[in-house]
Structures are given as structure tokens and as C-alpha cells.
Design a protein with these regions (language model features):
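Non-heme di-metal
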Residues: 1-198
């Protein structure tokens, strides 16, 4: 899917659907974190207004998804609870920081590429969830199909913004491929828990 170098373990979807309360609560937290991250990036680099506007649009869409997932939790009588530490995202950011060129544009481009990779993994997982839910006749399958398309669009937005910030498409694509290999190794270490990423 997109730039990913590893596929999710085939057992994950069944585990996620079997413990859907946990998966759905984790999904809500992921949407809020995605919105927060997009806004954080938009406000840290105000010198690039088009980038800030695009990231604000992403944040608004992620916040809408958060509201939708919260409504699903409420309808199913599931408590959101506190978020668990997102070790997947933390490890990915740590690995990127070790190899970043540390210039303002390089740092922003890397943060955007990390966002793109997280969107790509979400995209893959939502496709798997949509298929698994459809196989069980669950009415939420179309919801996850729609999210699959949204996450794919966010992935493209993040990559395009990284290219715009950096101004060097071949270098950005090479960096994305490098970071995608790291993401694949990190994702593989987390096994098959009923969470969206790790």
C-alpha cells in the first residue's frame, strides 16, 4: 500500500475485529493525534502559508473523523479511556531524528514524511478492517472504506508538501523510501495487537 515496505500480519484484522471496542477506542485517539500533529506542524512553520493552510485542512478532516469515531463509541456504549503511549509513532520519530539533516526545511520535510508514513499505515489497516467487517456483515465496513480513501489522500498531501518545502522531489522520494524501510521494521516489531498502528 502506497510506500509501505512491509504488510500487516494477516492475523491482525481478525484480532482487531474480535476486540473491536479496543480497536475503536485506539482509532479515536489516533484521529485526535493526527489532527494535533497537523496543527502543530502548521504553527511551527508559519513562513510557509500554503503548507500551513493544507495542514489545517488535514487537521479539520482528522478532527471530523475523531467526532465520527466518538459517536460510534457512544452508540456502542464503549468508553474512550486514556490513550496508551504510541510507541510506534515515537520510535518512528526517534529513528528519523537520528538521521535528519537538522536544517529547518529538512526537519519540516522529515516531519511531513513521518506523517505520510503514519497515514500510509492507517490506510492499509483501514482497508483490512473494511474487508474484515464486510466479511462479517458489519455495517461499519463502508465507513472504513471511506477512511481508507481519506488516509490515502492525506498521505499524498504530506508527500507533496514535503516536496514543496524541500524543493527537491528526487531527494524527498529517496528519503521517503529510506524512512519507509525503517517504518516497516518498526511496524513488524509490534505484532498483532488490536490497535491501528502498533
Amino acid at each position: 500500500v502506497l510506500c509501505l515496505t512491509s504488510s500487516t500480519d494477516p492475523r491482525w484484522a481478525a484480532i482487531a475485529v474480535d476486540d473491536f471496542a479496543t480497536t475503536l477506542a485506539d482509532h479515536a485517539h489516533c484521529e485526535m493525534k493526527a489532527a494535533t500533529n497537523a496543527l502543530s506542524l502548521a504553527t511551527r512553520w508559519p513562513a510557509t502559508p500554503r503548507v500551513a493552510r493544507a495542514l489545517t485542512d488535514v487537521a479539520e478532516e482528522e478532527l471530523r473523523h475523531f467526532r465520527e469515531v466518538m459517536a460510534l463509541l457512544e452508540a456502542r456504549g464503549i468508553e474512550l479511556g486514556r490513550p496508551e503511549s504510541d510507541l510506534y509513532a515515537a520510535e518512528l520519530r526517534r529513528a528519523v531524528n537520528l538521521t535528519s539533516d537538522k536544517t529547518p526545511h529538512g526537519s519540516l520535510a522529515d516531519r511531513l514524511l513521518v506523517g505520510a508514513l503514519i497515514e500510509a499505515r492507517s490506510c492499509e489497516r483501514f482497508r483490512l478492517l473494511a474487508d474484515a467487517l464486510a466479511a462479517r456483515g458489519d455495517a461499519l465496513a463502508p465507513f472504513y472504506e471511506d477512511l481508507f480513501a481519506c488516509e490515502a489522500r492525506h498521505y499524498t498531501t504530506m508527500v507533496d508538501l514535503a516536496i514543496e518545502v524541500r524543493g527537491e522531489a528526487p531527494q524527498v522520494r529517496a528519503r521517503l523510501a529510506e524512512l519507509a524501510r525503517v517504518e516497516g521494521e518498526i511496524a513488524a516489531r509490534f505484532g498483532v495487537r488490536p490497535t491501528i498502528h502498533g
